[in-house]
C-alpha cells in the first residue's frame, strides 16, 4: 500500500544517532541503527516514489527517563525532564515530514543552539576522522569545496 500510494515513512530517531554519550552506549547504538535503517530505506523506496524522513530530536520534556526506569524495575527516574522544553517542535517536524510536498531526509530538532552546535560539530569531527591517515585523504581545499557543493543543495533555514 505504501508503494501504491507513493506515501511517506517517518521514523523518530535522536541526535544520539549522531552523538554517542558516555553511559548511553545502548541507547546511542539503537539510534545509530535507526539512522542506518532510515538511510537504507530511503534509497530503497526512492525509485517507488515513497519519501522517507528521519526526525532527530534533542532533549525535550518526555517520559523517557521514567519509562526506562520502569523497564529496569526501579522507581528512580533516570532523568527528570519536567523542566525541559515542550516537544511541540518535534511534533511540527513530524508533520512537515509527513505533509510538506518535498520532505527533507532529516529533521534535526533541538531545543537550543548548544544542542545543535554539539551535534553538527560531532558530525564534522567524524568527517575529519574518516578523512585522516589513509591513501585517499582529501586536503582542506577539497573538503571545503565538497562542503560548499553540499550546502548549495541544502534548503534555506525557516
Would you name each region that the model predicts?
Residues 1-6:
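A short helix-coil junction within the Rossmann-fold of NAD(P)-dependent oxidoreductases
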Residues 85, 106-117:
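Short-chain dehydrogenase/reductase
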Residues 47-104:
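SDR active-site lid
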Residues 19-25:
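Active-site loop immediately N-terminal to the catalytic Tyr-X3-Lys motif
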